[in-house]
Amino acid sequence: MSAQAQMRAMLDQLMGTSRDGDTTRQRIKFSDDRVCKSHLLNCCPHDVLSGTRMDLGECLKVHDLALRADYEIASKEQDFFFELDAMDHLQSFIADCDRRTEVSKKRLAETQEEISAEVAAKAERVHELNEEIGKLLAKVEQLGAEGNVEESQKVMDEVEKARAKKREAEEVYRNSMPASSFQQQKLRVCEVCSAYLGLHDNDRRLADHFGGKLHLGFIEIREKLEELKRVVAEKQEKRNQERLKRREEREREEREKLRRSRSHSKNPKRSRSREHRRHRSRSMSRERKRRTRSKSREKRHRHRSRSSSRSRSRSHQRSRHSSRDRSRERSKRRSSKERFRDQDLASRDRDRSSRDRSPRDRDRKDKKRSYESANGRSEDRRSSEEREAGEI
């Protein structure tokens, strides 16, 4: 794989399928059945054991780091229960490994039938010491790589003690067996990875086995399987509790409904009176609301009528005042006209009297004065009538 491809894979693992903003780049979703659920949980045996002596090859399902990143983001908001599928996958794989281990043990047991139980126990002791030394040496290498020199020195002291115990156990085992059978009985099966181990292998070889990728890969798979079992058991327990809680709630509701129906059937009068009281209270509340609405409407109507009557009275008063003013103006004009007319007539009469002093003229003047006085009275009567009409 080139450096560019490695960088692209790292970006997919960190940011998911839509790292470039293109959502159509990846048509398959992580929830698809074609996607390996063990790969999404980072525990697929095809990935863990790749490059070892038990390499399983390429997985039949889809493996994509971007899909794993999408699943990690989505699993924070929703539980997809992919742990169950991964647990089934790992269980089948570990069961196959345990089956191979049992077969290898049976093959070794067929060649070791003549060995007594005491000799077998001594051989078991030698093998246990070999495993202990190998694990301690692998730990020493790990501590040295981390730079923890003091801890690695302490572990090396334990390794030396285990080596001394191993030499003693080998001496006891060698003395308890004949020389011919001692050379034949030198193999043992590893309980973790089902690989063959020699009873007389040196420490370096044992350390390489226990610190190797195959053995550590099987340890990782077995630990992941135990973790998945625990997680699945917790989730199933939680789901069972929720289901039981919902069932109890349904049963409680059903009991409550049954109790209510029984109480209604036992006391129909009480239920009727209850219904009657409810209906009555509802009707009373409706009546109160209706009254309040009608009162508010009446208040609004009164207010409007008062305002309209006030406006009408004001307009009527204004019209009355205006009519009075107009009538007064008219009367003033008429009185001034009559005054001028009387003065004019008086001046004319004086002139005529001075000119005509005959009795005939006097009679005519008297008739004329009587006629003009009658006309003045009629005009006064008309002005008074017009004044009254204006006031009305």
Curated annotation (Swiss-Prot):
Residues 235-392 are annotated as: Disordered. It comes from the Eukaryota. One of its GO terms (biological process) is mRNA splice site recognition. Pfam families: LUC7. Residues 102-177 form a coiled coil. Keywords: Coiled coil, Hydroxylation, Nucleus, Phosphoprotein. The keyword Nucleus applies. It is found in: Nucleus speckle; Nucleus, Nucleoplasm. One of its GO terms (cellular component) is nuclear speck. All isoforms are expressed in brain, kidney, heart, thymus, stomach, skeletal muscle, testis and spinal cord. Its main location: nucleus. GO terms for molecular function: enzyme binding; mRNA binding. Residues 235-257, 337-364, 377-392 have a biased composition (Basic and acidic residues). The modification Phosphoserine is found at residue 18. The modification 5-hydroxylysine is found at residues 266, 269. Residues 258-321 have a biased composition (Basic residues). May bind to RNA via its Arg/Ser-rich domain. Interacts with SCNM1. Belongs to the Luc7 family. This is Putative RNA-binding protein Luc7-like 2. It comes from Mus musculus. The lineage of its organism: Eukaryota, Metazoa, Chordata, Craniata, Vertebrata.
